[in-house]
Structure formats: structure tokens, C-alpha cells
Design a protein with these regions (language model features):
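A conserved ligand/cofactor-binding region detector
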Residues: 1-285
Length: 285
């Protein structure tokens, strides 16, 4: 619960911990293979899914500046090429912001980097929108005693997308309209979906075998081929095989759960699952 100062500090520390751990791992793995970060943009792409991992940007800057000796321009150029941002919020008032005092106290070095990012951003924006101080203040990374996570992402990222065609148009016309004017080529649409090569090809070999037998293996390279399965919607033989695959997968999961946690569940029951953080606003209580 972050309705009080202690909760806000804890959440900010959690966000930094997860971001810093991820960036540290990426950098370490890259250096073990290439011994330099000069080519990081050629080998690594980091997608920021909403603003919660925004601290990955100043943390990457910290590593490049403090630990690797890059100058600011080179370090920021690497970040611009590496980071992309997916927006999930169309209301400006709902965008994530952090009180400057909390941010500065909790993450002093990261705050210093964000302050310098803000200073340079304001200089660049002043050249793009001369005399329009209102626009510059709205797009700034720090303002009204708040660190604006979405603006850090929008200013840095090489790609900014919504999660549906309509959503992507809305953010261009409203919440990020000024950034759209500033860097229009960065705005794209990526409709929400799953990485089916992971959640189907790698995770569900039984279903893949059935698909191979019914529609061929073209779907492995072109997901639109999956629509060919529609013609089997009333095929009792195919539906029977599908149910057998589902049951086998449920038995596998039940076995794994029993071995790893000691919990025993009936694979013939309905599995109603939620993978979400535990929080009162999720109505889990």
C-alpha cells in the first residue's frame, strides 16, 4: 500500500531494485561476450512496459558514466538507441510521478542524473519550440516538485507505442501530443498480444503437434495461419484431441505444483488463474 510516505519509499526502492538488477545483468552478460558497451545498441533492445521500470534509463546512464567512463553525449546516445517505451495510460493525471524530496532522499545519484537529463531536455525543447515556455514546462522531466517518469521515457525512447491502434492515436493526440510534435517518427502502434513462439511453440508441444497435423506448420512463421483452425470448430475428432491435450497439460501442472509446493489439486477441475500483484485495488481480498 503506497498511500503513505513509507509505502511510496518502499515502492520506489522496489522499482529501482528490479530495474538496477535487470540492467546490471544485461550489462554483465554483454560485457562477458563483447568486452565493450560501444556496440550495446547493436545487440540489446530494452522495452519499458509502462513507467514502472523507467529507472532503468538513469541506471544505465549511471553505469555508462560512473563505471565505464563514457561522456554524457555518448552515454545518452546509447540509451536512446537501446530503450523503447510502451504506454498504457491515456490520462495525463494518471501518469506516474514521484515527489522530488522522496526521490532525492531515496536515490541521490539517480536524482542527479535525472536533473541533468531535465536540464539538457529543456535546452533541446527550447530550440524545438522557441518561446513556448508552457510547452517546455509540460514536457520537462521534472516539474511542480515531481519527477515525471513518463516524460523520462518519452524523451529518451527511440520508439513510443500504445497497445491498440486507437490507443496509439489517442496518446499522439492528447497525453503525448507535444512529444509527438517533437519526435513524430518515434510513435508507433503495437497491438497487445502474446509471444506465441514462447507460449505456444515452446510451452505447449502437445497443441503444436495437433496444429501440425491439422493446418501444417506454416503458423510457426506466420501467426495468421492459425485462423485455418477455424474450419475444425465442429470437428469432433479434433475437439476430442484438444481436450486430451488440455487435460494432459493440467496433469503436468498439478504434478509440478505438488512436487514444488506440496499443494494437491484435481486436474479435472477448472483452473481459474490470475498472475497479478497482490493489491487491494485488484479486488483480491
Amino acid at each position: 500500500n503506497d498511500n503513505h510516505v513509507e509505502g511510496k519509499i518502499l515502492r520506489l526502492r522496489q522499482q529501482y531494485f528490479l530495474s538496477a538488477a535487470s540492467i546490471g545483468d544485461i550489462v554483465q552478460n554483454h560485457l562477458s561476450s563483447y568486452a565493450t558497451l560501444e556496440n550495446l545498441p547493436d545487440k540489446v533492445a530494452i522495452q519499458l512496459n509502462d513507467t514502472h521500470p523507467t529507472l532503468a534509463i538513469p541506471e544505465m546512464m549511471r553505469i555508462l558514466l560512473d563505471e565505464c567512463g563514457f561522456d554524457w553525449d555518448k552515454a545518452f546516445s546509447i540509451c536512446q538507441k537501446v530503450f523503447s517505451y510502451t504506454n498504457h495510460t491515456v490520462m495525463a493525471e494518471a501518469l506516474e510521478k514521484w515527489n522530488v524530496d522522496i526521490f532525492k532522499m531515496t536515490l541521490p545519484r539517480i536524482y542527479q542524473i535525472v536533473v541533468e537529463m531535465d536540464r539538457r531536455a529543456r535546452e533541446e525543447l527550447a530550440k524545438a519550440f522557441p518561446g513556448d515556455q508552457g510547452k517546455i514546462d509540460y514536457m520537462a522531466l521534472i516539474g511542480d516538485n515531481q519527477v515525471r517518469m513518463a516524460n523520462i521515457c518519452a524523451y529518451t525512447a527511440n520508439s513510443i507505442n500504445g497497445v491498440s491502434k486507437l490507443h496509439s492515436e489517442i496518446i499522439k493526440e492528447s497525453v503525448f501530443h507535444d512529444y509527438y510534435l517533437f519526435k513524430p517518427n518515434a510513435f508507433k502502434n503495437v497491438t497487445n498480444g502474446i509471444a506465441y513462439r514462447r507460449w505456444l511453440l515452446a510451452s505447449n508441444p502437445g497443441l503444436c503437434k495437433l496444429l501440425d497435423e491439422t493446418i501444417g506448420d506454416g503458423y510457426k512463421h506466420d501467426a495468421s495461419d492459425l485462423t485455418k483452425l477455424n474450419k475444425y470448430a465442429d470437428d469432433k475428432t479434433v475437439l476430442k484431441k484438444l481436450n486430451e491435450i488440455k487435460l494432459a497439460n493440467k496433469k503436468d501442472f498439478a504434478s509440478y505444483l505438488a512436487k514444488s509446493t506440496g499443494q494437491v489439486i484435481d486436474p479435472n477441475s477448472i483452473f481459474d488463474c490470475q498472475v497479478k500483484r497482490m493489491h487491494e485495488y485488484k479486488r483480491q481480498h
